[in-house]
Swiss-Prot record:
UniProt name for this protein: DNA-directed RNA polymerase subunit alpha
Organism per entry: Pseudothermotoga lettingae (strain ATCC BAA-301 / DSM 14385 / NBRC 107922 / TMO) (Thermotoga lettingae)
Role, per record: DNA-dependent RNA polymerase catalyzes the transcription of DNA into RNA using the four ribonucleoside triphosphates as substrates.
Top-level division of the source organism's lineage: Bacteria
Subunit structure: Homodimer. The RNAP catalytic core consists of 2 alpha, 1 beta, 1 beta' and 1 omega subunit. When a sigma factor is associated with the core the holoenzyme is formed, which can initiate transcription.
Region annotation Alpha N-terminal domain (alpha-NTD): where it falls in the sequence: 1-234
Domains as described in the record: The N-terminal domain is essential for RNAP assembly and basal transcription, whereas the C-terminal domain is involved in interaction with transcriptional regulators and with upstream promoter elements.
UniProt record similarity statement: Belongs to the RNA polymerase alpha chain family.
EC number(s) recorded for this UniProt protein: 2.7.7.6
This protein's GO CC annotations: cytoplasm; DNA-directed RNA polymerase complex
Residue ranges of the region described as Alpha C-terminal domain (alpha-CTD): 264-332
Length: 332
């Protein structure tokens, strides 16, 4: 009979809460060779792309009236594009089911700072980072605008927000994922005399709207639901497996060496993103040649590149998520 070595349980090595995020580190070991990468990559992709949340997807300026993001507001230091970039960093939590778009309002006079705490949200909603600065106002500033939020998953570019609920609506990229970053690496582990088993270390950073444990549980549920469909679709009465799964505890495992899949991804050329020629040339002119070079830049850094506008930024973000499950730093 063939034996498969599997872990007895997932070990939570570290959990902590920071001002802007939650963090947790997990260890799953030992596993048969290759399973660390298989499981780690699957979890990472689902965590970054498929955990639902609520995000701001549009804005409408009522006082003063403005109709596009390339404009300015009297008495406000930041232009509308900068304000929108800050709005995308708001961490919005909903304790009630969200089936339709939700309207929120902001009314503020200067002087002073406009922060996320100034947003009036409906019952059942909460802003997890109320101290986030959105704009700087002087004595001339007198603002009244509406924000629209909806439920979703992953990243939805502004140009795909086709349903404009009000005249003057300016769409905003839907940054729905509550998971900010996921890393995993695979180390070689020894069980008795064999040294070719896998030990998978998984790190998760989430917004303050969800705990890493909850996000991980949801990701596992999503994967299991898909795999269960395959199992349920196969004919019954198949011959039993001539294998045995042998659980081994973490204490029986010795770590030998580290092999980081993340390093391999970071060394890939940006050509693998399959960007348009315009976006690709803009990045290369700014000496961005690899995925690692790209991830060192924030969204604001990229927008400073000549001829690299919001549409190019949306394209890069979408391709990073689709191809590698990665996301850019927000900056600030």
């Amino acid at each position: 009979m063939i034996e498969y070595v599997i872990p007895k349980k997932l070990k939570i090595e570290e959990e902590r809460s920071e001002t802007e995020y939650y963090y947790a580190r997990y260890v799953l070991s030992p596993m048969e060779k290759g399973y660390g990468t298989t499981i780690g990559n699957a979890l990472r992709r689902v965590l970054l792309s498929s955990i639902p949340s609520v995000a701001i997807v549009g804005i409408r300026f009522i006082k003063p009236e403005k109709y596009h993001e390339f404009d300015t507001l009297p008495g406000v230091k930041e232009d509308i594009l900068e304000i929108i970039l800050n709005l995308k960093r708001i961490q919005l939590r909903a304790d009630v089911p969200v089936r339709e778009r939700v309207k929120m309002t902001v009314e503020k006079r200067g002087p002073g700072n406009l922060t996320a705490a100034d947003i009036k949200v409906p019952a059942g909603f909460e802003i997890a980072n109320p101290s986030l600065k959105i704009a700087t106002l002087d004595e001339e500033a007198d603002l009244f605008f509406e924000l629209y939020a909806q439920a979703g998953k992953g990243f939805v570019p502004a140009q795909e927000m086709d349903d404009h609920p009000e005249i003057g609506w300016i769409p905003i990229d839907g940054v729905f994922s509550p998971v900010m970053k996921v890393n995993f690496r695979v180390e070689s582990a020894r069980v008795e005399k064999r040294t070719d088993y896998d030990k998978m270390i998984l790190e998760i950073w989430t917004k303050k709207t969800i705990f890493p444990n909850e996000a991980l549980k949801r990701a596992v549920d999503i994967l299991m639901n898909h795999l269960q469909i395959i199992t349920d679709s196969l004919p019954e009465g198949m011959p039993p497996l001539t294998t045995e799964f042998v659980p081994i505890s973490q204490e029986e495992v010795k770590v030998e060496q580290t092999v980081s899949e993340e390093e391999a991804v970071y060394s890939k050329k940006i050509d693998e993103l399959e960007l348009t020629i315009r976006s690709l040339n803009c990045l290369r002119r700014d000496k961005i040649e690899t995925i690692g070079d790209l991830l060192k830049r924030t969204e604001e850094d990229l927008l400073k590149i000549k001829n690299f506008g919001p549409k190019s930024l949306d394209e890069v973000k979408q391709k990073l998520l689709e191809k590698f499950g990665l996301s850019l730093k927000k900056g600030g």
